[in-house]
Swiss-Prot record:
Gene3D superfamilies: Aldolase class I (3.20.20.70). This is Biotin synthase. The gene is bioB. Belongs to the radical SAM superfamily. Biotin synthase family. Its cofactor is [4Fe-4S] cluster; [2Fe-2S] cluster. PROSITE patterns: RADICAL_SAM. Homodimer. It comes from the Bacteria. It catalyses: (4R,5S)-dethiobiotin + (sulfur carrier)-SH + 2 reduced [2Fe-2S]-[ferredoxin] + 2 S-adenosyl-L-methionine = (sulfur carrier)-H + biotin + 2 5'-deoxyadenosine + 2 L-methionine + 2 oxidized [2Fe-2S]-[ferredoxin]. HAMAP family: BioB (MF_01694).
Length: 352
């Protein structure tokens, strides 16, 4: 193992060397990833997030993996943008069960001018509760990123999904360059980036390596890198894809950890299909973030109590973050709710 692998943050990875990491013996790869992980993180701490779908279904994008796409008949019930108060109530629940970050996702190509004021109120309200805030709203322009940053948004999620070469086989309604441009706007506005991809869409090893290279060779690494395993949903074009080999998925996590040593690598969608042994291997490979709770946008996620039971058996604890004192925290929640009740924007955006 080279010293540079454990000590240096790089932005010049080449395909051949990344493929060589993937092709190592499994135990060697995990040892290397765990060594890198321990150099930058407490190996027995995992960051815990909760994800809420604030607007579900009827998305105009044609992402072949997604049950929210309006192009496919998946039986998913379309829902309007959630009211701000309801979002804050869900955020309070997430806080109560141990989440430190609250992520809000909307099935949009991009947020409209009509919806942005409501979105900004959600950010401000959740932030006031002492939670980190994250949103995924689709493509953003420069003004929207500035507005979100000013409202206090900590993270913006915008996945690259796969390699540039394979991307056109999965999505045709948005270009890869548009995704990269959104990430650039987010970074320029001073927010942190959450960006990763999906395994199990029919991609090759070159594509998996290519995705990680795109992320690792950005001017700054994403602070959070979600690695998703395809959740096959009837009605989507990828519903019959072959399952991802569990060891291949663990390899993806390990290589992500080596390439982006200071990033949180998130064990994301597909965790419901993983047994406890596979999840334990994922943490050994350097995954140190999970989504917590019963739903991951529109697909099932392991129940929160099961997560805590597994953490206890593995000696893992949720990653701590700076908190307000209980009294101040409760006051912040109450104040946020009062402000929302008195705001003219405290209504369903779809009726505006």
């Amino acid at each position: 193992m080279s010293a540079s692998t454990t000590a240096t943050t790089r932005h010049d990875w080449a395909l051949a060397e990344v493929k060589a990491l993937f092709q190592q013996p499994f135990n060697d790869l995990l040892f290397q990833a765990q060594t890198v992980h321990r150099a930058h993180f407490d190996p027995n701490r995992v960051q815990v997030s909760t994800l809420l779908s604030i607007k579900t279904g009827a998305c105009p994008e044609d992402c072949k993996y997604c049950p929210q796409s309006g192009h496919y008949n998946t039986g998913l019930e379309k829902q309007k943008l959630m009211e701000v108060q309801k979002v804050l109530e869900e955020a309070a629940r997430a806080k109560a069960i141990g989440s430190t970050r609250f992520c809000m996702g909307a099935a949009w190509k991009h947020p409209s001018a009509k919806d942005m004021p409501y979105v900004l109120e959600m950010v401000k309200g959740v932030k006031a509760m002492g939670l980190e805030t994250c949103m995924t709203l689709g493509k953003l322009d420069q003004e929207q990123t500035k507005a979100l940053a000013q409202a206090g948004l900590d993270y913006y999620n915008h996945n690259l999904d796969t390699s540039p070469e394979f991307y056109g086989s999965i999505i045709t309604t948005r270009t890869y360059s548009e995704r990269l441009q959104t990430l650039a706007y987010v970074r320029d506005a001073g927010m942190k980036i959450c960006s990763g991809g999906i395994l199990g869409m029919g991609e090759s090893l070159d594509d998996r390596a290519g995705l990680l290279i795109q992320l690792a060779n950005l001017p700054e690494h994403p602070e959070s890198v979600p690695i998703n395993m395809l959740v096959k949903v009837a009605g989507t074009p990828l519903a019959e894809e072959e399952d991802v080999d569990p060891f291949d998925f663990i390899r993806m996590l390990a290589v992500a950890r080596i390439l982006m040593p200071k990033s949180h690598v998130r064990l994301s969608a597909g965790r419901e299909q993983m047994n406890e042994q596979m999840q334990a291997l994922a943490f050994m490979a350097g995954a140190n973030s999970i989504f917590y709770g019963e739903k991951l946008l529109t697909t099932a996620n392991p129940q929160a109590d099961k997560d805590m039971q597994l953490f206890a058996r593995l000696g893992i604890k949720p990653e701590a973050r700076e908190e307000h004192a209980d009294e101040v925290h409760q006051a912040a929640i109450e104040q946020a709710l009062v402000e929302q009740r008195s705001s003219e924007m405290f209504y369903d955006a779809a009726t505006a």
